[in-house]
C-alpha cells in the first residue's frame, strides 16, 4: 500500500519489529538491574534469572504455641486431636487436622 509515494505497509511492519526489539531490550535491562539489586556478594556479580524469585510459596508452623520445632510435633501421636499444622500461603490461611 502506497500513500504519497511511501510504502506504508512496509513502514508499519518495520515499526512493529523495532518496537518489539526495543521492548525486549528494556525488559532485559530491567532484569539486569533487578539481578544486581538482589544478588549477594560482589558488585559485578549478577544473579541467575532463576534465582530472582526464591521466596517460598508456603510456610508451615505449629498451630499450638509451646512446641518449638516440627520434629517435636512429629514425635507426638499423630492421631491426637489437638495436633494441627497451620499453613500460610499466598492469600490463604487455613488449618488442617492431622486426623482428617
Swiss-Prot record:
Compositionally skewed regions (Basic and acidic residues) per UniProt: 69-78
For the region Disordered, what residue ranges are annotated? 31-54, 59-78
Where does the source fall among the domains of life? Bacteria
Keywords from UniProt, A to Z, are: Plasmid
Additional remark text: Transgenic plants containing rolA display an abnormal phenotype.
User: This protein is called what?
Assistant: Protein RolA
- Specify the species: Rhizobium rhizogenes (Agrobacterium rhizogenes)
Organism lineage reads as:
Bacteria, Pseudomonadati, Pseudomonadota, Alphaproteobacteria, Hyphomicrobiales
Amino acid at each position: 500500500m502506497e500513500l504519497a509515494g511511501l510504502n506504508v505497509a512496509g513502514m508499519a511492519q518495520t515499526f512493529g519489529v523495532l518496537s518489539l526489539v526495543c521492548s525486549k531490550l528494556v525488559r532485559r535491562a530491567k532484569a539486569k538491574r533487578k539481578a544486581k539489586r538482589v544478588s549477594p556478594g560482589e558488585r559485578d556479580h549478577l544473579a541467575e534469572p532463576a534465582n530472582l524469585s526464591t521466596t517460598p510459596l508456603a510456610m508451615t508452623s505449629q498451630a499450638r504455641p509451646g512446641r518449638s520445632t516440627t520434629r517435636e510435633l512429629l514425635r507426638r501421636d499423630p492421631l491426637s486431636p489437638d495436633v494441627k499444622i497451620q499453613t500460610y500461603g499466598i492469600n490463604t490461611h487455613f488449618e488442617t487436622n492431622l486426623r482428617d
